C-alpha cells in the first residue's frame, strides 16, 4: 500500500523508540529491565470494586441512575473534588506540606499518571532551545520529552547521595555565560531516584531549593517512589520546604504505591497549574472518573494497612538482588537504595559496553536489564565539575547497568543475578 507522502514531525526523527519499550519484546526468565510493580495490594481491589459495585446497584434500584452515569462520564479537567481532597489530606499529613485544611485541596491537580504531568509541564514551559537542568543519569521518560519539545538538556553528575546542589549552581552559571540565558527548570527525583536509586539527604534538598529560588528557576520534584521507602529515615519532600509553593512543581502517582491506575496527583505554583489544566483539556479532557474513584476508596480505607506490606515485599526483593550482586558480580560499584525499584551498577572497565553485552550475551542467556547509556541525554550537554565546562552529551558512559528488583520474586532475582554475575565475570576477564 502507498500512503500519503507527508513528512512527520521533526521530533520523530530526533527520538528513537524508548529503550524500555523496545526491550519489552524479549521474553526472558530473568526480567530486570522496566520498573514493573510486582508487589501490589491485591487483597484491596476486590473489596474496592465490590464497594463501588454495591454503591452503583443501590443508586440504580433507588432511581438515581444519573449518579452511576456520572461514574463513567467526563469529569472536571483538574480532577474530581472529592479525590483531590483525599490527596490533599494525605500530602499534608504524610509529607508535611503546608496546605490549608479547608481550601488546600484546590491546589491539587489530577493527571493521567505522572508521565502526563511531565508532558504537560514541559509543554507549557518550554520553547525551542530553552535549557533544562537534570541529573546524570536521568529518567529517560523526562529527558526525552524535553528533547521532543526542542529543549536543551544540561545533565549534572551526582554521587551516591543524588544531585549535588553546588554542581547545579555552577552549571546554571556556566549556562548563562555560554548561552546568554538561564535554564527554565531543574528536575530531580529526591527519593530513590530512577535510574540510580539514590536518595538525597535533607541538607541537599534544602540547598537545591535555595539554588532554584536564588536563580529564579522552577524545581520539578518527581516523587514517584516516595511511599516505597523500606530502609532508613523517611525524609520530607523538597516541596515541604517551599512554604509558599512558588517554586516546586510536585508530582506524585498511584502507579508505584497502589497499582498502575494512571492517576497522578500534583501540586504546582498557581500560574503553572492554570496553564497545565488548559493543556490537559486539549490533551485528554480529563482523567477517567472510575479510576479516580478506585484511588479515592483505596487511600481512604486501605492505604495504611497495605503500604507496609508493599514496602516489605520490595525490601525483600532489594535484599535478594543486593546480596547476589555483592557475592557474585565482578569488582565494580553499585548504589545502595533505601527504597524504589532500582540498583545502578558500574563495571570497573570504562570501555565495557553494557548494551553490546546485553544483546550478545545477556539476552541469549535469558537475562534482561536496561543499559546505562539509555539514561543519558540524546542531545544536549553534560556538566564536568572538574573543568566547569559543558561538553557534548553524545560521549556518555557505556559501562553501567540499571537493574530492577521490582517485578520478580526474591528467589528468582537471586538466581538470575548470580547467573548475570557469572556471565559478566567471564566477559570482563
What is each stretch, according to the model?
Residues 30, 149, 214-215, 365, ...:
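Helix C-cap/helix->beta junction micro-motif
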Residues 39-41, 296, 312-322, 333-347, ...:
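Conserved glycine-rich beta-strand-loop-beta hairpin in the small C-terminal domain of fold type I
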Residues 222:
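Glycine-centered flexible beta-alpha turn that most often forms the glycine-rich phosphate-binding loop
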Residues 243-315, 323:
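Conserved core segment of the aminotransferase class I/II
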